Structures are given as structure tokens and as C-alpha cells.
């Protein structure tokens, strides 16, 4: 784990400038979640509007919305693909994203252009440097 001030950045993941992370699993699917920075900036989460299973998304499309006591925020797809699973535990317990944003993923995607799109994402070290610049 890399620490940037009060924020944690987990190694082995890919990151976007919008503070989403992507984890490539052994079967080639991708878990998507929000970073520690995102959950701290949002504050206490009240609701996660999970995407529909079967939904096709392009990289950068809105994947879902998260409501906190402060605001409603959109979560963007870090890679293109089909939503094949959602973390239903978040429906009843959105605070799981506050408690451990790296273990509690939002959606699992079957990616359609993974090799190309991963090149456009940051690794943990690059994301940590990006956070330092904010």
C-alpha cells in the first residue's frame, strides 16, 4: 500500500484520473471500484445505484452513481465491456465503500478492449504522483 498524506493507494490495480480503480482477475474479467481518495472526498455514502447486469459500457461512460451526505457523484467505467456482475451487498450497505474501498468493488466487467485501454490507465505509483499534484 502506498500512502499519500491521508490517502491509501493499493498496488497491483489500475487507476483513472476520476478516482476509479480496475483490477484484472485471472479469468480476464475486471473488477471496478472507487479509490480511497474518492470515498474520503465523498464522505459517508448513503446509496449506490448499481449498474444493470448486461449493460454495455465504453471506457469513460457513466457506470453508476453514488450518493453521499455531501453530493451525488458519477462513477465512470475505466475500461469498455459488459457488466456481468454487481456487488449487491452495496445495496444495503453502501458504507462498505467507506470502510474498505479496495476490497469492496462495485461491478465486474467482461472487457472488450482490455489490452489497449489498460495502457491509458495509471499504475499505483503514477496514481500516487497524480494525487500529490491535486
From Swiss-Prot:
This is Probable glycine cleavage system H protein. The gene is gcvH. GO terms for cellular component: cytoplasm; glycine cleavage complex. Keywords: Lipoyl. The lineage of its organism: Archaea, Methanobacteriati, Methanobacteriota, Thermococci, Thermococcales. Transmembrane segments: none annotated. InterPro entries: 2-oxoA_DH_lipoyl-BS (IPR003016), Biotin_lipoyl (IPR000089), GCV_H (IPR002930), GCV_H/Fam206 (IPR033753), GCV_H_sub (IPR017453), Single_hybrid_motif (IPR011053). Belongs to the GcvH family. Residues 29-110 form the Lipoyl-binding domain. The glycine cleavage system is composed of four proteins: P, T, L and H. It comes from the Archaea. The modification N6-lipoyllysine is found at residue 70. Pfam families: GCV_H. PANTHER family: GLYCINE CLEAVAGE SYSTEM H PROTEIN (PTHR11715), GLYCINE CLEAVAGE SYSTEM H PROTEIN-RELATED (PTHR11715:SF3). Binds 1 lipoyl cofactor covalently. Its cofactor is (R)-lipoate.
Amino acid at each position: 500500500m502506498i500512502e499519500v498524506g491521508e490517502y491509501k493507494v493499493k498496488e497491483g490495480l489500475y487507476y483513472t484520473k476520476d478516482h476509479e480503480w480496475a483490477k484484472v482477475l485471472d479469468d480476464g474479467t475486471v473488477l471496478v471500484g472507487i479509490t480511497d481518495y474518492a470515498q474520503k472526498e465523498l464522505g459517508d455514502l448513503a446509496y449506490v445505484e448499481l449498474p444493470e447486469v448486461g449493460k454495455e459500457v465504453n471506457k469513460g461512460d457513466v457506470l453508476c452513481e453514488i450518493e453521499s451526505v455531501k453530493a451525488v457523484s458519477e462513477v465512470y467505467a475505466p475500461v469498455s465491456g459488459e457488466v456481468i456482475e454487481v456487488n449487491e451487498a452495496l445495496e444495503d450497505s453502501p458504507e462498505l465503500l467507506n470502510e474498505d474501498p479496495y476490497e469492496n468493488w462495485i461491478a465486474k466487467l467482461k472487457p472488450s478492449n482490455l489490452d489497449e485501454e489498460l495502457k491509458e490507465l495509471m499504475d499505483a505509483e503514477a496514481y500516487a504522483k497524480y494525487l500529490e499534484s491535486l
